[in-house]
Each structure stands twice: as structure tokens, then as C-alpha cells.
């Protein structure tokens, strides 16, 4: 916005050369006004430390959902954070969580509200994908964990077909590929191809450019699952 105002002022003073100069100067001030430590996409902005601590808080809700803290689930979260942020940063996140946040009661609606207000829909899809990974770390997702995941998805205002699509990646049954592509089992090849294009666009990692690296990795995994589901259904239809 600043660059355009500056361009107009420049034009009124020096005509076309002034417009160019005003645009450049305005763009420079816009750059200075951006907080470089924020994760940004369109009109959404969230500080990395806020994102990471809230993500860890949601992780804790899943780990404690069935009343039993599984070591594999703890290791999954720790390995994930170390892999995405490095050991030093991950240790700092865990320290802050343990000393400042863990002792407090975590309210689901407060946590999800942060993500609704400060992240894109695509980012929230990847958060859900990550949480499913935690629940499945011990090789099984309990009904209680599924219920908690459903509550989180609802709290983050995710569509039911999107929830079912991600769920199908972890809870296996015969029509998983259809659920991943969010189509009916009676779909023909044209329906499958159309659904694939839609899902590939929705989950393409490029849509999360500039977002937290952990969410980009989740998008890449989901994108691969969409491709696998599409290929499986096309093979099935051709047989």
C-alpha cells in the first residue's frame, strides 16, 4: 500500500520518473515495516515461537488423550521438532514449554483460536496431519484419540471431507484412496482425475511457501499420499 501512495505522490511532483522513484522508496519502507522473524502468508502472520509452542501444546493434548502417555508418541514429537528446527532450538522450545506452559491448563478452544486467527487453512491442514502422526506413533489410533483429533479439527474450522481425507492416510480400510481424494467409491476415471487435480492444488507444498518448515514437510507427505491414491485408483479402473 505504501509503495502505491508514494508512487502517486512522486507522479504529482515529478511525473513518470517521480512515480518510479516513489514506488521504489515506498517498497523499501514496506520492507522495513515487515517483521522478518514472522511466518507470513497473505494477511496471516504468526511468530515462530508462538507457532511452535502452540503446536507442542496441541501435541500434548493428543499424547494425553487416552490417559496413557506412550513413549513412542513422545519420541515422535521430539524427533519431529529436532528434525525440523535443530536440537538446540528444539531443546529451547521444550524448556519453555516445561517451565512456562506445561503446568497451566491447556484449553483447546484457545489453542485452536490462535491458529484460526494467525495461519492459513492449508497450514491448519498440515497441523492436523502432524497430530494424526503422533496418535499413530504407537501403530494404533484409539477411539479417544480420534475423538480428540476430531475436536481439534472442528476447533480449527477444518471441513469434514478434509478431516476424513487425512484420517484415511492413517486409519486404513478398503476405500481409503477414495477418501484421500474426497470422492465417492462410484467415481469414474474423469471424476478421479478431476479430484486429483483439485487435491494436488490444495496440498501442493508451494502453497505453504514462507510457512513453518515443519508444515511444509507435512504438505509434502500429504501430497505424496494424494499421488499414491490417484495412481492406485487409476490402476484399479484400468484392470
Q: What residue ranges belong to the model's regions?
A:
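Small-residue-enriched hydrophobic alpha-helices in membranes
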Residues: 1-64, 68-239
Amino acid at each position: 500500500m505504501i509503495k502505491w501512495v508514494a508512487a502517486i505522490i512522486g507522479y504529482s511532483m515529478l511525473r513518470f520518473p517521480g512515480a518510479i522513484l516513489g514506488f521504489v522508496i515506498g517498497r523499501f519502507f514496506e520492507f522495513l515495516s515487515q517483521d522478518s522473524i514472522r511466518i507470513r502468508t497473505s494477511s496471516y502472520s504468526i511468530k515462530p515461537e508462538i507457532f511452535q509452542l502452540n503446536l507442542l501444546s496441541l501435541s500434548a493434548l493428543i499424547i494425553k488423550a487416552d490417559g496413557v502417555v506412550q513413549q513412542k508418541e513422545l519420541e515422535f514429537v521430539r524427533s519431529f521438532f529436532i528434525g525440523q528446527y535443530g536440537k538446540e532450538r528444539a531443546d529451547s522450545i521444550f524448556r519453555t514449554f516445561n517451565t512456562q506452559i506445561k503446568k497451566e491448563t491447556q484449553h483447546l478452544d484457545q489453542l485452536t483460536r490462535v491458529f484460526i486467527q494467525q495461519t492459513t487453512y492449508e497450514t491448519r491442514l498440515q497441523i492436523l496431519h502432524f497430530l494424526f502422526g503422533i496418535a499413530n506413533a504407537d501403530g494404533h489410533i484409539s477411539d479417544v484419540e480420534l475423538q480428540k483429533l476430531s475436536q481439534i479439527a472442528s476447533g480449527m474450522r477444518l471441513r469434514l471431507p478434509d478431516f476424513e481425507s487425512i484420517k484415511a492416510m492413517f486409519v486404513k480400510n478398503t476405500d481409503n484412496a477414495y477418501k484421500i481424494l474426497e470422492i465417492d467409491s462410484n467415481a469414474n476415471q474423469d471424476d478421479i482425475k478431476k479430484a486429483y487435480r483439485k487435491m494436488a492444488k490444495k496440498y501442493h507444498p508451494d502453497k505453504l511457501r514462507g510457512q513453518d518448515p515443519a508444515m511444509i514437510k507435512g504438505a509434502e507427505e500429504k501430497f505424496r499420499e494424494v499421488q499414491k491414491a490417484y495412481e492406485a485408483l487409476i490402476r484399479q479402473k484400468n484392470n
